[in-house]
Amino acid sequence: NNNFRTALWTGNNLQVTLMSIGVGDDIGLEVHTSGDQFIRIEEGDALVKMGDSQDNLDFQRRVSDGYAIMIPAGKWHDIVNLGNKPLKLYVIYAPPQHPQGTVHNTKKDAEAAEFNRIY
């Protein structure tokens, strides 16, 4: 997957998305209030940041190939690509977070879609 985000599979209670994060870029600081998230790093080096508020990301850990990150509902989080190639990961959302068939070619596309969904 070379898109920022591709919703690979969406069920009633679960969704799997593939992501490719550019060099020096990040997922974007966010919080999901209604569901948990599982992230697995398939390829690359990253920094995971998590906390109870966007101003208090008191958990930070370097991760790489094979690492899994569990993010409980209500935790602010971001993942920053620290490597010199795109960061490849997959995300499991429970419940689904994005419309079935979602494809965001770039982070900018994803941010615009999120803005339009909220407002």
Predicted features and spans:
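A short glycine-rich, His/Asp/Glu-containing loop-to-beta-strand
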Residues: 1-29, 35
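A short, compositionally biased micro-patch
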Residues: 11, 22-24, 34, 41, ...
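Short hydrophobic/aromatic-rich beta-strand segments that constitute the beta-sheet cores
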Residues: 18, 48-50, 89
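Short beta-strand His + acidic residue motifs that chelate non-heme Fe in jelly-roll/DSBH
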Residues: 29, 48-49, 71, 77-84
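Glycine- and acidic-residue-biased ligand/ion/polar-headgroup-sensing regions
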Residues: 34-51
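Short acidic-glycine-tyrosine-enriched beta hairpin
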Residues: 53-72
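Double-stranded beta-helix
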Residues: 80-119
